Structures are given as C-alpha cells and as structure tokens.
C-alpha cells in the first residue's frame, strides 16, 4: 500500500517507467507551442454613441423658402447656425418660428447666440457655456 501511495505522488521507484524523449517528439513539441502562441487576438473595436463626423452648417437665409434647407440639415442630425443679417425682422421671426417647431420635433434646442444669430442643435449635441452680452430683443 505504501508503494501505491508513493507511486501516486511520484515519490516511488518510477525510473523504470520513465522514457527518454526521442528526437521526433522533441521536434514536434516546439511547433505545437508556436501554433498556440499565434492564436488570433480577440480584440473588438468599440463604437461610440456619438458620431465623430458631426458637422455644423452655416446659413444666411435671404428668403423664407431657405428655411426648408435649414430644417433638412437639422433632420440629418447636423447642428445649424443661422445669421439673419440679410432678412428683415418679420421674416426672421417667421423662420425662427418654423425652426422652433422643427427643433421641438427632433428633441433638439434653439439658442440665441448673437443679436441676429441663432444656433439650432439636434438631440445628440450639447452646448456648454453661455453668452454674457445682452441682446437687443427688439430685433427678433
């Protein structure tokens, strides 16, 4: 019984059972380990929720029908800056009213960033900071 336990733990007389490795088995061993180290990596690139190619479109509308192109850009999830220098105040109000509805429909925001300049952003944009200057409210 003691011999069995010694053999089980590798302490006993096991010289007779040991075989010298042959050259063929030694040559085969490195190729197996080489193939194991060449396994393909399991790396998966992570895709972010926000697009890296975000764009901001600039518009200076001259007539009311220009609002259609501005709204199309917003529906494509692009931010828009609108400069109302080239339209009268009544036309600018109509365009801002239309864009307010468009921005509401896409869960975006519209912000006044200058006397006659507005920023419209879709839902996936965030604006930080604020303007400290007082705007002339009689213009729009």
Curated annotation (Swiss-Prot):
GO terms for biological process: division septum assembly; FtsZ-dependent cytokinesis. InterPro entries: Cell_div_SepF, Cell_div_SepF/SepF-rel, SepF-like_sf. Keywords: Cell cycle, Cell division, Cytoplasm, Septation. Pfam families: SepF. GO terms for cellular component: cytoplasm. It comes from the Bacteria. It is found in: Cytoplasm. Residues 15-47 are annotated as: Disordered. Homodimer. Interacts with FtsZ. Cell division protein that is part of the divisome complex and is recruited early to the Z-ring. Probably stimulates Z-ring formation, perhaps through the cross-linking of FtsZ protofilaments. Its function overlaps with FtsA. Belongs to the SepF family. This is Cell division protein SepF. It comes from Lactiplantibacillus plantarum (strain ATCC BAA-793 / NCIMB 8826 / WCFS1) (Lactobacillus plantarum). The gene is sepF.
């Amino acid at each position: 019984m003691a011999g069995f336990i010694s053999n089980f733990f590798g302490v006993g007389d096991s010289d007779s059972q040991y075989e010298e490795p042959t050259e063929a088995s030694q040559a085969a061993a490195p190729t197996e380990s080489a193939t194991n180290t060449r396994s393909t990596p399991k790396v998966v690139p992570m895709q972010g929720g926000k697009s890296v190619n975000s764009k901001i479109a600039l518009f200076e509308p001259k007539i009311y029908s220009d609002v259609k192109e501005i709204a199309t850009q917003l529906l494509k999830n692009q931010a828009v800056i609108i400069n109302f220098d080239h339209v009268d105040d009544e036309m600018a109000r109509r365009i801002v009213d239309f864009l307010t509805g468009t921005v509401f429909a896409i869960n975006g925001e519209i912000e006044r960033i200058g006397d006659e300049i507005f920023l419209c952003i879709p839902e996936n944009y965030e604006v930080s900071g604020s303007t400290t200057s007082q705007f002339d409210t009689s213009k729009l």
